[in-house]
Amino acid sequence: MATPTNNYNTIVGSPMPTATTAATTTTVTPTQKELNIEDLQLFPSILDIISRIKDDEIDLIRAINLANETRTKTIETLNKLPGINRSLENQEELLKTYKQTLKKKVELLEKLKKLEIFEKYNKIKSTSSQSPQIQSKLELQTELSQTEPSQTEPSQTEPSQTEPSQTESSQIESSQIESSQTETEKSKETTEDIMKE
């Protein structure tokens, strides 16, 4: 039986090796380089690099698991929302009915505001919400008007004092009316904006 080296040599066409040449080839072995201290100092740094890679993999796996958990919780929360299973057409129909209901309610509120009872209430409310200074002036005015008939001579100075206060009260009333009108206009504008949406 022939060895592979013998077959190779016969195929190539070289002469067959003799026993002396075979012995010389087997005795020759490459010498290995001995490890120095410098080579051994690389091991801790290599070990550190490998451990960091493992730690990064563990951290990455934890982060992926946490992201998957939050994603599933979010999907569950979204599925629990009311009306999430409605189609787009159903949602548009609901929106339309809600807008119509809102429009009817706004119209009814406007009708109620125009009733005489509520107009009187709004006037009373606006006079009660006046600042304390205006209320004190009005109280002084009523006190002066009650004391005028009992006094005879100082009546000449008092009417001059009461006249400006009367003009002040009329100005206050007109400003209150204007402010209430602007408030109603603003509320109408906001309701119209809501209806447009």
From Swiss-Prot:
Origin species: Dictyostelium discoideum (Social amoeba)
Keyword Protein transport in record: no
Subunit structure: Component of the Mediator complex.
Disulfide bond annotation, renumbered to this chain: none
Keywords, alphabetical: Activator, Coiled coil, Nucleus, Transcription, Transcription regulation
Function: Component of the Mediator complex, a coactivator involved in the regulated transcription of nearly all RNA polymerase II-dependent genes. Mediator functions as a bridge to convey information from gene-specific regulatory proteins to the basal RNA polymerase II transcription machinery. Mediator is recruited to promoters by direct interactions with regulatory proteins and serves as a scaffold for the assembly of a functional preinitiation complex with RNA polymerase II and the general transcription factors.
GO biological process: transcription by RNA polymerase II
Gene label: med9
Polar residues composition-biased segments: 126-144
Source domain of life: Eukaryota
Gene Ontology MF term list: structural molecule activity
Skewed-composition ranges (Basic and acidic residues): 183-197
Coiled coil, from the record: 83-117
Protein name: Putative mediator of RNA polymerase II transcription subunit 9
